């Protein structure tokens, strides 16, 4: 059986401490669930916080990197995939993830959410700002919201549960 890969997406450079804390908490829960964590793979912001927390919790981490330089990868990424496609890697991130958790927002993260909505991938915003929710709601995007990492995991389990 194929293992479940879930993505944690959020700002790299410029990520808030709150976004990184939520991502780290969530990544620990993802690892405890036995799911594989996918991030953008760099040693910055939400990507680093999530990868490091999942690794500490004994989880497997995958990083989808924009360039062709191994040194871009976080040391907490177990499987680094160099794409050489720059920001277009966001589509790989989205299509490789069964569920996308969003911790914070940036231009790159917004692009990932838009791609996920177009591809029909479940998106769960974790402690998102009202402006972010209102923006994506104005696009008629389908997504879930959670106020905590634990609530986000409950939603993800429901979304990933086999149909009866």
What do these predicted regions represent?
Residues 2-19, 28, 32-33:
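Generic N-terminal amphipathic, Lys/Arg-enriched alpha-helix
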Residues 99-100, 146-164:
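A charged, well-structured terminal subsegment
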Residues 34-35, 39-42:
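A positional/architectural concept
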Residues 131-145:
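Catalytic binding pocket for nucleotide-activated donors in carbohydrate/polymer assembly enzymes
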Residues 80-84, 126, 141-155:
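Short acidic-hydrophobic, aromatic-tinged amphipathic segments that line or gate anion-handling sites
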Residues 21-28, 41-119, 129-135:
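Acidic/glycine-enriched connector segments
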């Amino acid at each position: 059986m194929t293992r479940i890969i879930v993505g944690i997406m959020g700002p790299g450079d410029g990520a808030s401490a709150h976004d990184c804390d939520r991502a780290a908490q969530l990544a620990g829960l993802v690892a405890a669930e036995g799911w594989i964590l996918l991030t953008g793979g760099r040693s910055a912001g939400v990507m680093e916080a999530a990868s490091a927390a999942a690794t500490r919790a004994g989880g497997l981490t995958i990083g989808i990197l924009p360039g062709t330089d191994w040194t871009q990868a976080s040391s907490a990424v177990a499987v680094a995939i160099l794409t050489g496609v720059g920001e277009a890697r966001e589509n790989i991130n989205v299509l490789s993830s069964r569920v996308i958790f969003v911790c914070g927002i940036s231009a790159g993260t917004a692009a990932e959410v838009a791609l996920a909505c177009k591809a029909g991938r479940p998106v769960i915003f974790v402690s998102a700002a009202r402006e972010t929710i209102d923006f994506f709601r104005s696009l008629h995007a389908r997504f879930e919201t959670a106020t905590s990492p634990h609530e986000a995991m409950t939603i993800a389990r429901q979304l990933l549960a086999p149909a009866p």
